[in-house]
Amino acid sequence: MTSDDIPGNRADRTATPAASASVSAPASASTSGAVIEAAGVRRRYAGGFEAVAGVSFSVARGELFALLGTNGAGKTSTVELLEGLAAPDAGTVRVLGHDPFRERTAVRPRIGVMLQEGGFPSDLTVTETVRMWAGCTSGARPTGEALELVGLGHRARVRVKQLSGGERRRLDLALALLGRPEVLFLDEPTTGLDAEGRRDTWELVRELRDGGTTVLLTTHYLEEAETLADRLAIMHRGRIVTAGTTAEVTAARPARIRFELPEGVPAARLPLGLRAAAEGHRIEIRTHRLQESLDELLTWARESDVRLLGLDARSASLEEAFLDIAQSASESEKVAA
């Protein structure tokens, strides 16, 4: 999404104030429960293309939920429905108990949106840009506070056109946080940031969540989702193919054990039950019983007096689960065709 996708000015999409000046959600937030809900949601475009095909999920108050997927999976189309930029063709969407499209005035003042690609007047300074948006935001944070939150205080007098790509992303985040949102939508929040900037942003997002802000994150950085998300969902071709905690999503995928055998020790000597795949002396074992398989391997190595070189054993990562899901879904579609 870009700033051009938004009906009206962008400042309408920031949130209303809280009493405090911290990064926490407003004290006036409603009672606990799901604050983002999608049920059987479908979205079609001209020509009949269905970008969102029956998506259902919910996000609890104070939860950080990551929506992941391959390019064209339907993430942006789904998030646009949640942000109230369009109405679903079928199904229901609720944010803070309201239809975000038909009840915009009840929703928009309470949410913040960090776009994937913001649009700023390039000749304004950073401070002038924040003040301009703050002028359209009820009870906005002080400009200096917003800039310090995202690490741009020292760049306050710099013109926007002189900012790096990463600094522009920080400015996007500052604008999204101006109104102390109850619900925060983050679309690729750390694109263009260096490693330090990414970690700083992660820490800020954690503070927001810990303060009660509900966060919906879309990102291509799987490490980011793995680090931040309380729960996540992976989309493919308009559908959610798996959802849960990172541990739940990866648990269904095999762990792996990798090592090298010394010269003169063939892979055929390995215990048959390990089902090892060999490429020269390099061995990979994929297993759903990591502890048992590792114990069996180490017992064999000790009894056979074989040294396992570069031994590495680990559970499936989110990246491996993501790639496995995408590949499996694509293969299923080919078979169905």
Give the location of each predicted region.
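ABC transporter nucleotide-binding domain
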Residues: 201-288
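An acidic, carboxylate-rich microenvironment
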Residues: 90, 106, 128, 248, ...
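ABC transporter nucleotide-binding domains
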Residues: 33-38, 43-236, 242
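A generic structural signal for secondary-structure junctions
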Residues: 112, 134, 138, 251-254, ...
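ABC-family P-loop ATPase nucleotide-binding domain
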Residues: 1-43, 328-337
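N-terminal compositionally biased, intrinsically disordered segments and leader/signal-like regions
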Residues: 3, 15-17, 32, 71, ...
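Short, charged/small-residue-rich alpha-helical element at the C-terminal edge
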Residues: 255-329, 337
